[in-house]
Amino acid sequence: MRPLADEIRPQTLDDVAGQKHLLGEGALLRRLIENGTDANLIFYGPSGTGKTTVANIIARQAKKALYTLNATTASLQDVKNVMADVDTMMAPNGILLYLDEIQYFNKKQQQSLLEFLENGKITLIASTTENPYFYIYNALLSRSTVFEFKPLSVEDTIPAVERGLRIEQERSQLPFTWEEDVPRTVAAGCGGDVRKAINAVELLYRSAKPKDGGLYVTRDDALQLSQCSAMRYDREGDDHYDLLSALHKSIRGSDPDAAVYLSLIHISEPTRH
């Protein structure tokens, strides 16, 4: 059985949750995609916000051969293997390379792409959860357009959660139902990460209580699972410094009970600062 997150992945721009600033009617990225762009793109934003989904939609519309690499595991040789197919029968119209987690490529690996981006033989779509202006080589940035994906609101996430619950309902051999507030509770607890919300739906189904010959999920079940959901945070990136800055300002303002301090405690940030 396919993972729920894979089965529920949107196939069209209209199905993508949130990101109306990028994909709404008349938005720049949507127009580029619908016009069949060959531009090099960098998608920047937190996990579970649709970067990979949108890249896959672009790839399906492209007439170029699609190659996918993940920079966490790919090597320079993997990049060279992709380049070797340029102008061959494998890629007569050029190559669309989707490079996930590009921040894990070092400068030399990123530089290896430049020659082929210059001559148009390769179109690059890269995604990163880190600030691209810190982690991506300047020459690569200058040849690409950066689009920022933002965490989803609760209202944007609820339809995806409801769809996931319905799919589990269709899959289930027993009647599967849930309390009315479950979708909102799951959506509110995922921190704007749709993938996390869908994974929560899977876990709720697997842990559903027997009731009247079927399976049943309560709001309390969803709330308990949401409390286990990690807060968005990075130890060295923007979130780290934004929270510390807010902490310092709350102290200067004689507000020792500020909620931001509680956030730092929750994610176990040392208070040595």
Model-derived features with residue positions:
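Pre-Walker A (pre-P-loop) alpha-helix and adjacent loop at the N terminus of AAA/AAA+ ATPase modules
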Residues: 2-40
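Short glycine-rich substrate-engagement loop in P-loop NTPases that contacts/grips substrate
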Residues: 25, 67-95
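Walker A/P-loop
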Residues: 33-68, 114
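Conserved AAA+ ATPase "SRH/arginine-finger" region at the nucleotide-binding site
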Residues: 146-158
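Short conserved motifs of the RecA-like P-loop NTPase core
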Residues: 173-189, 243
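C-terminal helical "lid" of AAA+/P-loop NTPase domains
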Residues: 184-188, 195-209, 261
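Conserved C-terminal helix/linker of AAA+ ATPases
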Residues: 208-229
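Conserved small/polar residues in nucleotide/adenosyl-binding loops
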Residues: 265-273
